[in-house]
Amino acid sequence: MKTPIEVKILDPRIGTQFPLPAYATPGSAGMDLRAMVDTELTLAPGETKLIPTGIAIHVADPSLAAVILPRSGLGHKHGIVLGNLVGLIDSDYQGPLMVSCWNRSDTPFTLTLGERLAQLVFVPVVQAQFTLVDEFERSDRGEGGFGHSGTQ
């Protein structure tokens, strides 16, 4: 099932020189976002920069959100990850999609125009309503913190 999402092209090179984000295969969960930079951009070791993608989206449906995730190859091979780890796009946001790129490696990395730098994934959203209680119903796990669910 495909859900229509409104997209606005902010950079005229999208749709002419570079394709609109799309799923690469029928099983793809994410669409690649590209670096729509005017010139090559070098990230020094430890440096973070905000990179335009050339598009804006409006999800509109409050039961959906979008997340911007890193591309595994860039992170593993070059140390390029998202500066904010995950970007959350709320359904009512309508501004440009930007990618915070962080070079966590010890060597400079150069981004070129149109390079695929992140993925856009749409996810379902559940808005919770808190119910105040004095005590929780007991569970086997109880109050065990991080690493307390066992090893097997």
Swiss-Prot record:
Keyword Hydrolase recorded: yes
Pathway as given in its UniProt record: Pyrimidine metabolism; dUMP biosynthesis; dUMP from dCTP (dUTP route): step 2/2
Enzyme class: hydrolase
Positions bound to substrate: 71-73, 84, 88-90, 98
Coiled-coil region list: none
Domain of life: Bacteria
GO terms of biological process kind: dUMP biosynthetic process; dUTP catabolic process
EC number: 3.6.1.23
InterPro entries listed in its UniProt record: dUTPase (IPR008181), dUTPase-like (IPR029054), dUTPase-like_sf (IPR036157), dUTPase_trimeric (IPR033704)
Molecular function GO labels: dUTP diphosphatase activity; magnesium ion binding
Reaction catalysed by this enzyme: dUTP + H2O = dUMP + diphosphate + H(+)
Required cofactor(s): Mg(2+)
Keywords: Hydrolase, Magnesium, Metal-binding, Nucleotide metabolism
Keyword Hydrolase assigned: yes
One Pfam family per UniProt: dUTPase
HAMAP family on file: dUTPase_bact (MF_00116)
Cited function: This enzyme is involved in nucleotide metabolism: it produces dUMP, the immediate precursor of thymidine nucleotides and it decreases the intracellular concentration of dUTP so that uracil cannot be incorporated into DNA.
Family under the similarity heading: Belongs to the dUTPase family.
Name of this chain's protein: Deoxyuridine 5'-triphosphate nucleotidohydrolase
Natural source organism: Shewanella denitrificans (strain OS217 / ATCC BAA-1090 / DSM 15013)
Organism classification: Bacteria, Pseudomonadati, Pseudomonadota, Gammaproteobacteria, Alteromonadales
Gene: dut
